[in-house]
Amino acid sequence: MDKLIKTISESGSFRAYALDSTETVRTAQEKHNTLSSSTVALGRTLIANQILAANQKGDSKITVKVIGNGSFGHIISVADTKGHVKGYIQNPGVDIKKTATGEVLVGPFMGQGQFVSIIDYGTGNPYTSSTPLISGEIGEDFAYYLTESEQTPSAVGLNVLLDKEDKVKVAGGFMLQVLPGASEEEIARYEKRIQEMPAISTLLESDDHIEALLNAIYGDEPFKRLSEEELSFECDCSRERFENALLTLGKDELQAMKDEDHGAEIVCQFCQTKYEFSEADLEELIND
């Protein structure tokens, strides 16, 4: 089971999240049949949203949209405060690597665009904020969003590593944030450690990468573990939800669907689950 660990420095001036999202991203790859670059881009977006959702309370839902003008198209993710996340990428078939190193490329195929966050508190007035994409690598764009939009200086590292068959090997990341009251001396120490930190891909390949991430973040600084929360890819779609969506089309459209198509098939964008509606099902909706 994937997990996210919340920590705070003993001084109370910094907080850090470290997470293992391997099964989450593996499930996303299996459901959407993504190729290498698309897998990494979608995975990074899911991890970013898991971090954002961990910052929320109550029954909030957080939608992250990474909207670029490159080959990927849009990447959409929705997370809740219970550790569930779902998502999809418009173009699952991007598969580009550097010839010399085999490194999976993401940024060049994201293009220019926006990192958008929509927080739905369940009150009918969702809060939307956005920042420009600065690199298209998603991790850097997420850190920029946190610093600019949420006004919280943040360091972020997140990645997805693939095996020789381009299947998800490991996925995860971290977020470090400066809290009010941090001294200049403390900030300088943490900045130095983050700058000297091994590459996120190196840390993810450690036997226990959550511990490796926390050790790299805090060094010799004492810290407290606040909580450990389970994470998973989970879609909340249902037949009832799609029935309600069909009802919004109106009776004339449903009748045409019944007469001309002899039924309907709806595929959930987030998890690829198919819902079949027969002529009898449509007739029932028409008479509802």
Swiss-Prot record:
GO CC terms of this entry: cytoplasm
Function summary: Redox regulated molecular chaperone. Protects both thermally unfolding and oxidatively damaged proteins from irreversible aggregation. Plays an important role in the bacterial defense system toward oxidative stress.
Post-translational modification: Under oxidizing conditions two disulfide bonds are formed involving the reactive cysteines. Under reducing conditions zinc is bound to the reactive cysteines and the protein is inactive.
Protein name according to UniProt: 33 kDa chaperonin
Short name of one Pfam family: HSP33
Compartment(s) where it occurs, according to its Swiss-Prot or TrEMBL record: Cytoplasm
Disulfide bonds listed in the record: 235-237, 268-271
GO MF annotations, alphabetized: protein folding chaperone; unfolded protein binding
